[in-house]
């Protein structure tokens, strides 16, 4: 099928090239041809009649083609009415030749056929010109085919060769009109008309090798639908699973056969009317060829679809055959399993029959034993009633004792709670008193410290004054010595000078005053030193008293605080033990009540069962009292262990607080350590968060690239 389609496409390309060359030759010859006036007048009536017939034929074929080509996608046909051009002619002018122009574009496969029919004018003033009929057929995959002699076989099909490299088709449409004189006879006009008809009959000929096969190849192109139908009949039948597929195939085959039959009939009609409408025949044949090429493309598409469906159905049949083989294997395996199961069932049935026989014998033995146990039942019933009464009495006594013990434990717990509250209040009062005393001691210490500071300031002032007085005393002694030296010098000099004597006396008076001031300053200095020593002694005594008082108060407060904490822990442990004992007693009481109810229910059930049946049941046996659960046994030891752990934690916390309170460097070190740990954790969390975000972004990008 593919080789046939390739051959048809090669044929269409050859026709296109030859048609273009013929059109160019005819356009060159049209300008050179001139016919006599007598020939023009004689053939005017015949050409007008042939023009009318051709127009009627074109209208009917247009209707038929429009109805037949609606199913083909991308096909548009348009007929352009013949246009008239005014041509100035005289009696000696002649009519132009008939032109058949066909343009086939290889890219778009568009077929355009232009048919121009010039008409002769009756006189010199008429403006009638050549009639041009143009038809455009637009399709992406269509081609055209023509038959040489107009006979299209409908019954036989000849397969074309895979390729036609040497075939060429030359389309020659020309009308050779003989020149005649102005006074020609009717016989010459008849001869010219006959020659025109003969020239129109020879439309297509193949000058190259294989002339006889051209008609056969064109006939093969026309009968594409018939060949496809025959190939469909020759293909092996494939089981179709869907009825819709069959209906679609039948519908497509019917529509294609109907369209091809209509086009064939139209082509036959056109070829039969070749003599009367020569030029119309070429146009119709071109249209038929275009329609057949479009149908050929449609049939190619349908054939491809059918081949795809055929391959799909073959795959389905293969899968169905494989599944059938698999099911047959499963069936054989199931049959073998059924035989095995049947044999095993027969064996099991035989074993069950033997078991039934043994059970029947055992039932007989049990019936005999039941008859013997009926005698024992009456004696056991009396024993059971007495045991139940004793059990009820014991349970009531135990319940009463547990209630009394629970009440005593509750009273003890209340007393301990009240005593604990009282001790707690006393401890709080003592703590407040100690706090007041500590505040008073701190205020007294501050006051003593302030007095000591004031006295130290006074001592410093006195020391400064003493230093000043000592410096003044030394200066006065120096002046006194200077005066004595001067006095001695003056005595050695002239003793009779009165002024010098007066001056010496004045100097002596000054020396006396200076000595007196020195003595006074020394006395004041001694007094101040005595007072300073006294203040120093008082300060030392006050410091000793303050240190002794603060140390004693601190030790007393620590001792009292330790005693209170120990007492508080002891009371708390007592409360916990009392609460655990109370919970254990309540749980045991609830358990005993529950067991009592269960025993009563069992007694009622046993009584009902004794009345209903006379057989012995194992459920009516006496049940022993269950001991307390294991975790209740370990409650006492667990409470003591918990108390020891709490005491250990509390003592460790107290020691740590004392150590930190006494050593400020340790407090600072602990503070810096906590800050460092906090900052390190923040940095670590931030770093891990950044890494997690980077991993999430990388995973998202990988997922996007994968998608």
From Swiss-Prot:
Residues 1-664 are cytoplasmic. Residues 38-47, 83-95 have a biased composition (Low complexity). One of its GO terms (biological process) is Golgi organization. The chain crosses the membrane at residues 665-685. It is found in: Golgi apparatus membrane. It is a single-pass type II membrane protein. Residues 287-424, 452-608 form a coiled coil. Residues 68-80 have a biased composition (Polar residues). Its main location: Golgi. Residues 56-67, 139-150, 185-196, 245-254 have a biased composition (Basic and acidic residues). Residues 22-106, 121-196, 234-256 are annotated as: Disordered. Residues 686-707 are lumenal. The C-terminal domain (558-707) is necessary and sufficient for Golgi targeting. Golgi matrix protein playing a role in tethering of vesicles to Golgi membranes and in maintaining the overall structure of the Golgi apparatus. This is Golgin candidate 1. The lineage of its organism: Eukaryota, Viridiplantae, Streptophyta, Embryophyta, Tracheophyta.
């Amino acid at each position: 099928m593919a080789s046939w389609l390739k051959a048809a496409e090669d044929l269409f390309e050859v026709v296109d090239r030859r048609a273009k060359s013929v059109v160019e030759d005819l356009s060159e010859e049209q300008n050179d041809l001139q016919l006599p006036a007598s020939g023009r007048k004689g053939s005017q009536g015949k050409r007008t009649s042939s023009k009318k017939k051709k127009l009627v034929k074109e209208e009917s074929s247009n209707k038929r083609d429009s109805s037949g080509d609606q199913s083909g996608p991308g096909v548009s046909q348009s007929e352009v009415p013949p246009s008239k051009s005014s041509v100035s002619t005289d009696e000696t002018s002649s009519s132009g030749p008939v032109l058949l122009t066909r343009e086939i574009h290889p890219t778009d496969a568009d077929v355009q056929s232009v048919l121009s029919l010039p008409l002769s004018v009756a006189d010199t003033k008429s403006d009638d010109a050549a009639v041009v009929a143009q038809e455009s057929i637009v399709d992406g995959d269509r081609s055209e085919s023509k038959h040489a002699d107009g006979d299209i076989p409908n019954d036989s099909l000849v397969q074309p060769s895979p390729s036609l490299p040497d075939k060429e088709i030359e389309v020659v449409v020309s009308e050779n009109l003989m020149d005649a004189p102005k006074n020609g006879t009717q016989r010459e006009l008849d001869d010219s008309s006959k020659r025109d008809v003969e020239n129109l009959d020879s439309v297509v000929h193949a000058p190259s090798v294989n002339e006889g096969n051209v008609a056969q190849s064109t006939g093969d192109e026309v009968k594409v639908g018939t060949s496809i139908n025959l190939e469909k009949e020759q293909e092996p039948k494939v089981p179709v699973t869907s009825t819709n597929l069959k209906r679609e195939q039948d519908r497509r085959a019917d529509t294609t056969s109907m369209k091809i039959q209509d086009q064939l009939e139209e082509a036959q009609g056109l070829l039969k009317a070749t003599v009367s409408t020569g030029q119309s025949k070429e146009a119709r044949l071109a249209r038929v060829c275009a329609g057949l090429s479009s149908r050929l493309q449609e049939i190619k598409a349908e054939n491809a679809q059918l081949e795809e469906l055929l391959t799909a159905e073959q795959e389905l049949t293969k899968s169905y055959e494989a599944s059938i083989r698999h099911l047959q294997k499963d069936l054989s395996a199931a049959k073998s399993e059924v035989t095995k199961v049947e044999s095993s069932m027969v064996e099991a049935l035989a074993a069950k029959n033997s078991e039934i026989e043994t059970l029947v014998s055992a039932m007989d033995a049990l019936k005999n034993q039941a008859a013997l146990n009926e005698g024992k039942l009456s004696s056991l019933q009396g024993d059971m009633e007495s045991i139940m009464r004793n059990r009820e009495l014991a349970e009531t006594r135990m319940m009463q004792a547990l209630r009394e013990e629970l009440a005593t434990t509750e009273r003890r717990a209340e007393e301990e709670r009240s005593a604990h509250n009282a001790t707690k209040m006393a401890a709080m009062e003592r703590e407040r008193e100690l706090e007041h005393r500590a505040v008073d001691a701190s205020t007294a210490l501050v006051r003593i410290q302030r007095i000591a500071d004031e006295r130290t300031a006074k001592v410093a002032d006195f020391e400064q004054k003493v230093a000043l007085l000592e410096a003044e005393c030394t200066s006065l002694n120096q002046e006194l010595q200077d005066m004595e030296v001067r006095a001695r010098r003056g005595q050695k000099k002239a003793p009779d000078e009165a002024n010098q004597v007066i001056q010496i006396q004045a100097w002596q008076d000054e020396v006396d005053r200076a000595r007196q001031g020195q003595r006074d300053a020394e006395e004041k200095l001694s007094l101040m030193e005595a007072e300073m020593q006294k203040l120093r002694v008082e300060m030392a005594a006050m410091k000793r008293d303050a240190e002794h008082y603060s140390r004693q108060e601190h030790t007393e407060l620590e001792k009292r605080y330790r005693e209170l904490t120990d007492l508080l822990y002891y009371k708390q442990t007592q409360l916990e033990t009392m609460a655990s004992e109370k919970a254990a007693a309540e749980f045991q009481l609830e358990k005993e009540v529950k067991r009592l109810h269960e025993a009563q229910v069992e007694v009622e059930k046993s009584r009902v069962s004794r009345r209903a049946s006379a057989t012995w049941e194992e459920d009516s046996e006496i049940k022993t009292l269950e001991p307390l659960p294991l975790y209740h046994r370990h409650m006492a030891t667990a409470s003591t262990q918990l108390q020891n752990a709490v005491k250990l934690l509390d003592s460790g916390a107290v020691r740590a607080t004392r150590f930190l309170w006494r050593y400020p460097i340790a407090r600072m070190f602990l503070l810096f350590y906590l800050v460092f740990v906090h900052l390190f954790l923040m940095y670590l969390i931030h770093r891990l968060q950044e890494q997690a975000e980077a991993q999430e972004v990388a995973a998202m990008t990988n997922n996007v690239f994968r998608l």
